[in-house]
Protein backbone atom coordinates (compact mmCIF):
# COMPACT_ATOMS: atom_id res chain seq x y z
CA UNK A 1 0.00 0.00 0.00
CA UNK A 2 1.27 3.49 -0.78
CA UNK A 3 -0.13 6.54 1.04
CA UNK A 4 -1.95 7.08 4.30
CA UNK A 5 -3.66 4.00 5.74
CA UNK A 6 -7.42 4.04 6.36
CA UNK A 7 -7.60 3.49 10.11
CA UNK A 8 -11.25 2.48 9.84
CA UNK A 9 -10.54 -0.42 7.45
CA UNK A 10 -11.58 -3.45 9.52
CA UNK A 11 -10.12 -5.90 6.98
CA UNK A 12 -6.57 -4.89 8.03
CA UNK A 13 -5.08 -7.16 10.70
CA UNK A 14 -1.50 -5.82 10.50
CA UNK A 15 0.16 -2.81 8.91
CA UNK A 16 3.57 -1.22 9.31
CA UNK A 17 5.68 1.09 7.21
CA UNK A 18 7.73 -1.02 4.79
CA UNK A 19 10.27 0.64 2.47
CA UNK A 20 12.25 3.76 3.27
CA UNK A 21 11.52 7.03 1.46
CA UNK A 22 14.28 9.32 0.19
CA UNK A 23 14.52 12.62 2.04
CA UNK A 24 15.71 14.51 -1.05
CA UNK A 25 13.01 13.61 -3.58
CA UNK A 26 10.41 11.49 -1.74
CA UNK A 27 11.07 8.42 -3.90
CA UNK A 28 10.97 4.86 -2.58
CA UNK A 29 14.42 3.52 -1.68
CA UNK A 30 15.26 0.31 -3.54
CA UNK A 31 13.19 -2.02 -5.70
CA UNK A 32 9.45 -1.90 -5.03
CA UNK A 33 6.51 -3.65 -6.74
CA UNK A 34 2.89 -2.89 -5.84
CA UNK A 35 0.27 -5.30 -7.18
CA UNK A 36 2.45 -6.20 -10.15
CA UNK A 37 3.48 -2.63 -11.00
CA UNK A 38 7.13 -1.67 -10.42
CA UNK A 39 7.21 1.65 -8.57
CA UNK A 40 10.96 1.80 -7.90
CA UNK A 41 14.09 0.02 -9.08
CA UNK A 42 17.56 -0.36 -7.68
CA UNK A 43 19.57 -2.14 -5.04
CA UNK A 44 20.14 0.00 -1.99
CA UNK A 45 19.60 -2.76 0.55
CA UNK A 46 20.00 -6.51 0.12
CA UNK A 47 17.06 -7.58 2.30
CA UNK A 48 13.73 -8.22 0.58
CA UNK A 49 10.16 -9.27 1.22
CA UNK A 50 7.93 -10.64 -1.53
CA UNK A 51 4.28 -11.63 -1.46
CA UNK A 52 3.26 -13.61 -4.53
CA UNK A 53 0.14 -15.76 -4.85
CA UNK A 54 -0.39 -15.50 -1.09
CA UNK A 55 3.10 -16.77 -0.23
CA UNK A 56 5.37 -14.42 1.73
CA UNK A 57 9.13 -14.80 1.27
CA UNK A 58 11.73 -12.98 3.36
CA UNK A 59 15.35 -13.15 2.25
CA UNK A 60 18.69 -11.57 1.51
CA UNK A 61 20.11 -11.36 -2.03
CA UNK A 62 21.57 -8.80 -4.40
CA UNK A 63 19.42 -10.13 -7.21
CA UNK A 64 16.18 -11.94 -6.58
CA UNK A 65 14.00 -13.46 -9.30
CA UNK A 66 11.04 -12.62 -7.02
CA UNK A 67 11.11 -8.98 -8.22
CA UNK A 68 10.31 -10.12 -11.77
CA UNK A 69 7.88 -12.78 -10.55
CA UNK A 70 6.02 -10.15 -8.53
CA UNK A 71 5.61 -8.05 -11.69
CA UNK A 72 4.39 -11.05 -13.68
CA UNK A 73 1.88 -12.33 -11.09
CA UNK A 74 0.48 -9.06 -9.65
CA UNK A 75 2.52 -9.58 -6.51
CA UNK A 76 4.39 -7.34 -4.10
CA UNK A 77 8.10 -6.81 -3.43
CA UNK A 78 10.17 -4.36 -1.41
CA UNK A 79 13.71 -4.00 -0.14
CA UNK A 80 14.93 -3.15 3.35
CA UNK A 81 17.96 -3.65 5.59
CA UNK A 82 18.78 -7.36 6.08
CA UNK A 83 18.97 -8.44 9.72
CA UNK A 84 19.37 -12.23 9.60
CA UNK A 85 20.48 -14.38 6.68
CA UNK A 86 20.38 -18.17 7.14
CA UNK A 87 20.43 -17.80 10.95
CA UNK A 88 23.46 -15.49 10.78
CA UNK A 89 23.45 -11.88 11.98
CA UNK A 90 23.91 -9.31 9.20
CA UNK A 91 25.82 -6.18 10.25
CA UNK A 92 24.41 -2.81 9.16
CA UNK A 93 25.88 0.68 9.29
CA UNK A 94 22.90 2.20 11.15
CA UNK A 95 23.97 3.44 14.57
CA UNK A 96 22.04 4.64 17.58
CA UNK A 97 19.08 3.18 19.40
CA UNK A 98 15.46 3.25 18.32
CA UNK A 99 12.32 1.15 18.49
CA UNK A 100 13.04 -1.61 15.98
CA UNK A 101 10.67 -3.70 13.86
CA UNK A 102 11.27 -6.63 11.58
CA UNK A 103 9.54 -9.25 9.47
CA UNK A 104 10.93 -12.72 10.11
CA UNK A 105 10.85 -16.27 8.79
CA UNK A 106 11.46 -19.05 11.30
CA UNK A 107 11.01 -22.56 9.89
CA UNK A 108 8.47 -21.27 7.36
CA UNK A 109 6.44 -19.24 9.85
CA UNK A 110 6.27 -15.53 8.93
CA UNK A 111 5.84 -13.09 11.80
CA UNK A 112 6.55 -9.52 12.88
CA UNK A 113 8.67 -8.43 15.83
CA UNK A 114 8.91 -5.08 17.61
CA UNK A 115 11.20 -4.10 20.47
CA UNK A 116 9.55 -2.68 23.56
CA UNK A 117 12.51 -0.40 24.20
CA UNK A 118 14.98 1.48 22.00
CA UNK A 119 17.70 -0.93 20.80
CA UNK A 120 20.66 -0.82 18.44
CA UNK A 121 20.13 -2.54 15.12
CA UNK A 122 22.95 -4.96 16.01
CA UNK A 123 21.33 -5.97 19.32
CA UNK A 124 17.94 -6.36 17.62
CA UNK A 125 19.40 -8.62 14.93
CA UNK A 126 21.28 -10.63 17.57
CA UNK A 127 18.05 -11.17 19.52
CA UNK A 128 16.40 -12.51 16.36
CA UNK A 129 19.31 -14.93 15.83
CA UNK A 130 18.99 -16.01 19.47
CA UNK A 131 15.28 -16.70 18.86
CA UNK A 132 16.17 -19.07 16.01
CA UNK A 133 15.04 -16.83 13.15
CA UNK A 134 16.18 -18.08 9.73
CA UNK A 135 15.67 -14.86 7.73
CA UNK A 136 14.71 -11.33 8.79
CA UNK A 137 14.61 -7.84 7.35
CA UNK A 138 13.97 -4.49 8.93
CA UNK A 139 10.66 -2.66 8.89
CA UNK A 140 10.65 1.09 9.49
CA UNK A 141 10.71 1.57 13.26
CA UNK A 142 10.91 4.54 15.61
CA UNK A 143 7.76 6.67 15.39
CA UNK A 144 6.38 5.04 12.20
CA UNK A 145 2.69 4.34 12.86
CA UNK A 146 0.90 1.03 12.41
CA UNK A 147 -1.31 -1.49 14.17
CA UNK A 148 -2.02 -5.16 14.69
CA UNK A 149 -5.23 -6.99 15.58
CA UNK A 150 -4.82 -9.95 17.94
CA UNK A 151 -6.85 -13.17 17.91
CA UNK A 152 -9.40 -11.67 20.32
CA UNK A 153 -9.94 -8.70 17.99
CA UNK A 154 -8.09 -6.16 20.16
CA UNK A 155 -6.26 -3.47 18.23
CA UNK A 156 -2.66 -2.76 19.27
CA UNK A 157 -1.28 0.50 17.85
CA UNK A 158 2.41 1.38 17.70
CA UNK A 159 4.38 4.42 16.66
CA UNK A 160 3.05 7.97 16.57
CA UNK A 161 -0.35 8.36 14.90
CA UNK A 162 0.10 12.15 14.88
CA UNK A 163 3.64 12.27 13.51
CA UNK A 164 2.57 13.60 10.10
CA UNK A 165 0.55 16.60 11.24
CA UNK A 166 1.16 20.32 11.22
CA UNK A 167 4.38 21.17 9.40
CA UNK A 168 5.37 17.53 8.86
CA UNK A 169 3.88 16.14 5.70
CA UNK A 170 3.76 12.45 4.92
CA UNK A 171 5.88 11.72 1.85
CA UNK A 172 3.57 10.71 -1.00
CA UNK A 173 5.46 7.43 -1.47
CA UNK A 174 5.21 6.23 2.13
CA UNK A 175 4.60 2.50 1.80
CA UNK A 176 3.05 -0.07 4.12
CA UNK A 177 3.07 -3.82 4.41
CA UNK A 178 -0.58 -4.80 4.92
CA UNK A 179 -2.07 -8.11 5.98
CA UNK A 180 -5.84 -8.47 5.66
CA UNK A 181 -8.45 -10.91 6.89
CA UNK A 182 -9.17 -13.72 4.46
Outline where the language-model segments fall.
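Gly/Ser/Thr/Pro-rich low-complexity, intrinsically disordered segments
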Residues: 1-182
Amino acid sequence: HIGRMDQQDTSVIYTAQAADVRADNGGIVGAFVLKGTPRAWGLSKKGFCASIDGVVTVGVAENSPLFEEATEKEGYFFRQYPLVDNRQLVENALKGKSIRRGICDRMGEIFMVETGTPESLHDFAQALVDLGVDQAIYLVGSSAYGWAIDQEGTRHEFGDNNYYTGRRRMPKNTSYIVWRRK
